[in-house]
Amino acid sequence: MSDEWTPRTQLGKLVASGQIKTISEALKTKLPLKEYEIVDYLLPNIKDEVIDIKRAQRMTDSGRRMTYSITVVVGNEDGYIGLGIGRSKEAAPAIRKALINAKLNIMEIRRGCGSWECGCGRAHTLPFLVEGKSGSVRITLKPAPRGVGLAVGNVAKIILRMAGIEDAWGFAAGHTKTTVNYALAVYNALKETAKVRINPGIVLSTPIYSGSVINVSGHTD
């Protein structure tokens, strides 16, 4: 554990004491995630990318002032994804705020081989069709067979890749040029993969994977 991080929350203390060893365990506690360092520790391979930068000017008594609004996506490319927005008078602080917020919004998604055209049983696509919306933007994500790739818009490609989705078809409607709403719609669609309840009595034709399948052990000392 880094000396630079002193846990301040119950969840942080459980991680620091070794009682929680994976991000999956942390999220399942339902305890609020208020320390981004928890994500850094349990997902040391997490990546981040800026997907939108907006600058706005407003008049004040002292003249024109510039405000940055920046959107960042984080993920481990293996079942975990987060999205955050940060605002500040300068770009660097806005990026840092967005990065922290993205980590605090980290979530576990489900993957599988939900395409009837494939049936390989691997965690390369969505397990079933999901939909998400934000503002006027609505997006539908459908499972695709291996080799199709990500047949979606550029922003959606980044988010899906960060989440560990390799193949998918997507259909969007609304003001999709509004990047923030488009990104949030994709994020909300992925959130639906974890919300759908699966009857344990039903025999699935293909496995559904929650979270990481490449490295499920989290941080190792």
From Swiss-Prot:
Cellular component aspect of the GO annotation: cytosolic small ribosomal subunit
Keyword RNA-binding recorded: yes
Keywords tagged on the record: Ribonucleoprotein, Ribosomal protein, RNA-binding, rRNA-binding
Keyword rRNA-binding: yes
SUPFAM superfamilies in the cross-refs: dsRNA-binding domain-like (SSF54768), Ribosomal protein S5 domain 2-like (SSF54211)
Any one GO molecular function term: rRNA binding
GO-annotated biological processes: translation
Source taxon at top rank: Archaea
UniProt domain S5 DRBM: residue ranges: 46-109
Pfam (any one): Ribosomal_S5_C
InterPro entries hit by this protein: Ribosomal_Su5_D2-typ_SF, Ribosomal_uS5, Ribosomal_uS5_arc, Ribosomal_uS5_C, Ribosomal_uS5_euk/arc, Ribosomal_uS5_N, Ribosomal_uS5_N_CS, Ribsml_uS5_D2-typ_fold_subgr
Family (UniProt): Belongs to the universal ribosomal protein uS5 family.
Subunit structure: Part of the 30S ribosomal subunit. Contacts protein S4.
Function: With S4 and S12 plays an important role in translational accuracy.
Domain notes: The N-terminal domain interacts with the head of the 30S subunit; the C-terminal domain interacts with the body and contacts protein S4. The interaction surface between S4 and S5 is involved in control of translational fidelity.
Protein name (database record): Small ribosomal subunit protein uS5
Taxonomic source organism: Thermoplasma volcanium (strain ATCC 51530 / DSM 4299 / JCM 9571 / NBRC 15438 / GSS1)
